[in-house]
Amino acid sequence: MLSPQRTAAVASRGAGDAMENGKPGPVQVVLVHKEQHSFELEERALASVLLQDHIRDLDVVVVSVAGAFRKGKSFILDFMLRYLYSQKEHGHSNWLGDPEEPLTGFSWRGGSDPETTGIQIWSEVFTVKKPCGKEVAVVLMDTQGAFDSQSTVKDCATIFALSTMTSSVQIYNLSQNIQEDDLQQLQLFTEYGRLAMDEIFQKPFQTLMFLVRDWSFPYEYNYGLQGGMSFLDKRLQVKEHQHEEIQNVRNHIHSCFSDVTCFLLPHPGLQVATSPDFDGKLKEYIASEFKEQLQTLIPYVLNPSKLMEKEINGSKVTCRGLLEYFKAYIKIYQGEDLPHPKSMLQATAANNLAAAASAKDIYYSSMEEICGGEKPYLSPDILEEKHQEFKQLALDHFKKTKKMGGKDFSFRYQQELEEEITELYENFCKHNGSKNVFSTFRTPAVLFTGIAVLYIASGLTGFIGLEVVAQLFNCMVGLLLIALLTWGYIRYSGQYLELGGAIDSGAAYVLEQASSHIGNSTQAAVRDAIAGRPPADKKSQ
């Protein structure tokens, strides 16, 4: 954190470190350490731009261009610079200027290797007065090309997410078409940003523009905004027969951005792409239809009436505030709280499974502490109460864990977690029940009681001359005795567990029926006593 004195000193120096010979230039504000795949905020450089006296308290408009490397992002940004400088100096409509003038600004060149690393902003912040009379600060942002040979998916996701989180207009620069993998990458990157912002229930980002470069099908969809919007509507359309994953991608994009647009831009010309000597002069190489569409695209993005201030949580952000958000966001991505992105499908599944496993472990550990292996028998009512308490604790942990995929995607994993917790609870109940002394000796007690009762009944019936009934009781005594001996052997040897389970179930059924009959008789006797009536057996006398 910069002290007030240091902040003032940094701001008073302006963007001197980023300028050569007193001229504005690009300033590196997020540095990528490619070997360590880590990120560093150049706080001094960022402060030198955003804390200049004349703009620090103005609401800021941040226009960012992001996308795959070597697709002309810096090239487009330099035309934006030309437009802004033209409006600053004289404001006439011919902002493209002298056709003999080379294109300067953000570093760009033809070739196959990326030119920009990390995130850069232009050192001069433009002040623009909107039609309503409000003055705003306009910042242009350039990003590292995604998916170069040295960048991991996490590198790309972090850079794209940071630029999207801090910009009011994110231009997604694509080549030739909007492919399905472009949408999936966008879903992954924006979800990575939404995780860091803790935005779940509202749209965390503002404007997304798909800028499709080198559009080759003007006979299907015209160049420009109108053709682009028609093309985008078709590409992002959600249909019933589509696979769930494809539907989720489209729903996710609409849920993340308040406004989504598309602009189709023609190829600038073959010589622009192939000539090593091209320096951006409009007179040379650049196709007329490309220049024509540029004169529509750039004013559409930067016209004072179109400028949209950066908002976070519904509040407009000043240049001073943007610096603080940069510092807060970079700390999140430097930490270990966020999941490591792989692909959207892998990341969401693995991340949610990990969160569910962690929550399940919390429940299991908590229950083990009160009714685990060596813990004494616990009352079923207390066990149920603790189950509900620890279940809620586990669910709260799952909900609070940062997860990819959004609330709807995570809900199915929450349901699975609840089912697994229920299974664990049933196992804990069985284990707890086995600790009950009466439960342990329930089966032999029932069998022994049955043997004793039947033996006495056999003697009585034999005494009064009912030999057949007495022999029947004796047979039943023999069967119960065999069952008792068998149960004891099974308990001792651990064999024939199914037969032992059947004997236990039979004993439990007999005990349940006897208890139910005694309970009903007792309740009836109590009711009769309260009502002042004689018991049913006395009535019959």
From Swiss-Prot:
Task: According to the UniProt record, list the residues that bear N6-acetyllysine.
Answer: K391
Domain GB1/RHD3-type G span(s) in chain numbering = 57-306
Stretches of the chain found on the membrane's Lumenal side = 467
Q: Which residues bind GDP?
A: R70, K71, G72, K73, S74, F75, R109, R213, D214, V272, S275
Enzyme kind, highest EC tier: hydrolase
Which compartments is it annotated to reside in? Endoplasmic reticulum membrane
Q: What is its main location?
A: endoplasmic reticulum
Q: Where is this region: 3HB (three-helix bundle) domain?
A: 344-434
Can you supply a Gene Ontology BP term from the record? Answer: endoplasmic reticulum membrane fusion
Membrane topology per the record? Multi-pass membrane protein
Q: Where is the region Disordered?
A: 1-22
Q: Which family does it belong to?
A: Belongs to the TRAFAC class dynamin-like GTPase superfamily. GB1/RHD3 GTPase family. GB1 subfamily.
Q: What's the domain remark here?
A: The GB1/RHD3-type G domain mediates GTP-binding and hydrolysis as well as homodimerization.
Q: What is this protein called in UniProt?
A: Atlastin-3
Q: Which organism is it from?
A: Rattus norvegicus
User: Which classification does the entry list for the species?
Assistant: Eukaryota, Metazoa, Chordata, Craniata, Vertebrata
The protein's gene is named Atl3
